[in-house]
Amino acid sequence: IVAGWSAYPRQLDFVRFREIADKVGAYLFVDMAHFAGLVATGLHPSPVPHAHVVTSTTHKTLAGPRGGIILSNDAEIAKKLNSAVFPGQQGGPLEHVIAGKAVAFKIAASAEFKERQQRTLAGSRILAQRLTQADVAAKGISVLTGGTDVHLVLVDLRHSELDGQQAEDLLAKVEITVNRNSVPFDPRPPMTTSGLRIGTPALATRGFSEEAFAEVAEIIAQTLIAGAEGNTGVLPELKARILELAAAHPLYPNLKKIGE
């Protein structure tokens, strides 16, 4: 039994998954790549005590270098995993990536990292709340499941004049990067879609406060409303507001320019 997700805005019940697996004599495999940072800080239930095998990336919400980890509490399974990975699947070690993972794991144990994850959750909830308000709903735009418990929001465009591709392109024009995403019972083709997936970890990493997240949420809402109305004349002003936010939250605030 496989549990995990890449576009689901709620928590999973790993206890129940394990009960079902035990009942039918199955192994439980959980991929927590998307929400590992939340698990590390206690803001999301951990699958590790319940699953036979857990996998994760070391980037995404863990915010480390690109890579992966495989975990198991079962010694026999762990031995088989080790034998399967090396030498069959893995070659020479990349020491710089290993060092990057070590730094990421140390940071993940810090109070600063937990505060960042808390802002990540706060930001996604602020976004979900804004996108469920009446002016947005009037354009046929809603939020899947009505909210979020995690670091992302899945916008439902099935009843909107906008499709996922159009909405993605509109937001790109105001310098907001999101991705179109299929939603349950999606009537549109998979390369068009009727949804948007919007995540908040990158903004939290850049130091966005709840007030800044509220401004981003407002700009996203106004962009989607304008697109649904065919009123693209407001996009330059919305873009300017985003650029102002980005300038106030630089990627590397402590990085000095060469020559300084």
UniProtKB/Swiss-Prot annotation:
GO molecular function, one term: glycine hydroxymethyltransferase activity
Modified residues (N6-(pyridoxal phosphate)lysine): K60
Annotated disulfide bonds: none
Reactions listed under catalytic activity: (6R)-5,10-methylene-5,6,7,8-tetrahydrofolate + glycine + H2O = (6S)-5,6,7,8-tetrahydrofolate + L-serine
Pfam families reported for this sequence: SHMT
Quaternary assembly: Homodimer.
Name listed for the protein in its UniProt record: Serine hydroxymethyltransferase
Lineage: Bacteria, Bacillati, Actinomycetota, Actinomycetes, Mycobacteriales
